[in-house]
């Protein structure tokens, strides 16, 4: 079968292969024919592994940290497809061949304290398909039956088409983050205007945030490129957008802090940090009101050195919470119900961030480049 593999953690790039053996189905597994998959930031980090030592170390967690023992894997963890085969122990009420499905690609152990107390999303022994074991950038992927999400129960392709079904994993991160903030009737700041930040903007607007501030740092690409992202953010529901690069956009950061300071409470109720940029953490502390919440989904490329906990957490009485993955499976049900509801408007908002053209898996270099250049937010790959 066709597949996209990471062959080595000592060099950048990926390799497209045509002769990868199809995965075998275990007794409790489901084999899925991939219909569409989506490129995410994790995939980009795996592609550019030399500049992402944290990602390299994470991929080595399950073989003792020895790069010489690394086994090439198929990457990719956002996808949807059709059930091709089920193991003999799989309950037919869960799924059958031909069903339209996706899957939770975080594989939990089931026996640690977290798993046994309803917190499987932060399992101590978690493994991620496409990072630690073969993933979905291929014609077929095998997942444990417990992780299968049967989309037929939410209206199937008519309600959740593959162009959205392919990135439910990523959307779930944003839904989890926004829901932890209980944003209805609250002011919200979203730091980072990448895919996660834009999806969080759409979800926050859907769930009733009263005012939404979106920020990002224009970086080398310049303010003009970021301006396009800000236009998209406003289409998704943002009220205000600010470039925090004080060199490229003088006075915008000052204006942001002045405007946020006029909010009731002297800051926003909830900050969603979606970028992982070190500077954004202090921005979050400056923007949140006393007694507010900071929710962290973005993962820094390097250990943080400069967050002022005394000033921004202790003295403000702020609650800071890390967000990882999706609650299994509360986040999934909430997300799918929102998508299935025409009244929510979430599906229509998300259509604004999906590239019109799907890219064949064999042409993956072009797809990754489009995402890297921010010419696409969510781009689909098809085997």
Model-derived segments and their meaning:
Residues 65-77, 109-191:
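NAD(P)H dinucleotide-binding glycine-rich loop of Rossmann-like/cofactor-binding domains
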Residues 205-281:
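Adenosine-nucleotide cofactor-binding segment
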Residues 23-37, 52-113, 154-155:
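Glycine-rich beta-strand-centered segment in the early N-terminal region that forms part
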Residues 170, 192-196, 299:
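Glycine-rich Rossmann-fold phosphate-binding loop(s) that bind the pyrophosphate
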Residues 282-286, 329-383:
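C-terminal hydrophobic helical "lid"/dimerization subdomain
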